[in-house]
Amino acid sequence: MYSISFQEDSLLPRERLAKEGVEALSNQELLAILLRTGTRQASVFEIAQKVLNNLSSLTDLKKMTLQELQSLSGIGRVKAIELQAMIELGHRIHKHETLEMESILSSQKLAKKMQQELGDKKQEHLVALYLNTQNQIIHQQTIFIGSVTRSIAEPREILHYAIKHMATSLILVHNHPSGAVAPSQNDDHVTKLVKEACELMGIVLLDHLIVSHSNYFSYREKTDLI
């Protein structure tokens, strides 16, 4: 009896999706489809609702580790891995959509986008965004991921991708895992070096952003270095 109910647990939302479209489904139903089956103690709908009840918002699901997912009743290692894979794929799709020929209108707009991408990272990430003459992003490159004490990559590496993608300008973005966005002396030094190197190559350094989960610092807005 149990095996039959397990197999049919998520059948109804699947049928609804096929008939009414994915937009018609609730978060619980979508999660039930991904989880597929319940347990002897709880249906897949109950498990899906328990997962959602543990979140203050859907974005919290993206932040959960494998261990945290497995700690939820009804989710084993395989389901936790499948959920993480689904979440990451959705994140990459969203990233590609927002990146593809996006026009940069303001530091604030870009900072908000990069806060979502880098704000919760536990290590420092340096990212370079390369733009064309219409200020549209044509390429995004992670220059390095590492300790906050490590020196940022040489300007040569940053400019390599600018030349490769025929960019006319670029924007640097890095996160401060501490949450404080005030620039360090090293941040100032790197900004000066990259700007000087860009000028030699006829490329414009539009901005250098420092982001955290809830705040940002713009060299263009706050300093005379750019």
Swiss-Prot record:
Zn(2+) binds at H174, H176, D187. InterPro entries: MPN, RadC_JAB, RuvA_2-like, UPF0758, UPF0758_CS, UPF0758_N. It comes from Streptococcus pneumoniae serotype 4 (strain ATCC BAA-334 / TIGR4). Belongs to the UPF0758 family. Keywords: Hydrolase, Metal-binding, Metalloprotease, Protease, Zinc. Gene3D superfamilies: Cytidine Deaminase, domain 2. It holds the Pfam family RadC. Transmembrane segments: none annotated. GO terms for molecular function: metal ion binding; metallopeptidase activity. PANTHER family: DNA REPAIR PROTEIN RADC (PTHR30471), UPF0758 PROTEIN YEES-RELATED (PTHR30471:SF3). GO terms for biological process: proteolysis. Residues 103-225 form the MPN domain. This is UPF0758 protein SP_1088. CDD domains: MPN_DUF2466. A motif (JAMM motif) lies at residues 174-187.
